[in-house]
């Protein structure tokens, strides 16, 4: 299970996936490792053009968002009864995908501030 940062290489496509987490997200994924596994699978599907994933643009506000992140889209992924709010930066020319996971929790608690 990742601490604050995780890196993975897809041997088939040679794309490098970088995942960055808040401390809150690390705790959640330690309790719900299957959600992290499914999240990674869905990110790869999304990058490969699969539209059969429940991902939408996040409509809420993110507190304390740094300048770098303001330029990125904030997305929400549904995984069963859980939601993951994240940002993604795709560098296809360098074969790199950066994923910044902001929050992960149950559907009931994800949107509470």
Question: Which sequence ranges carry the predicted segments?
Answer:
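Short amphipathic alpha-helical surface micro-motifs
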Residues: 1-2, 38, 57, 66-69, ...
């Amino acid at each position: 299970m990742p601490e604050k940062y995780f890196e993975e290489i897809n041997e088939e496509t040679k794309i490098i996936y970088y995942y960055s987490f808040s401390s809150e997200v690390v705790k959640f994924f330690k309790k719900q490792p299957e959600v992290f596994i499914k999240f990674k699978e869905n990110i790869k599907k999304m990058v490969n053009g699969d539209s059969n994933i429940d991902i939408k643009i996040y409509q809420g506000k993110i507190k304390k968002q740094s300048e770098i992140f303001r330029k990125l889209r904030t997305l929400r992924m549904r995984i069963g009864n859980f939601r993951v709010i994240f940002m993604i930066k795709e560098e296809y020319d360098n074969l790199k995908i950066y994923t910044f996971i902001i929050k992960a929790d149950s559907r009931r608690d994800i949107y509470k501030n």
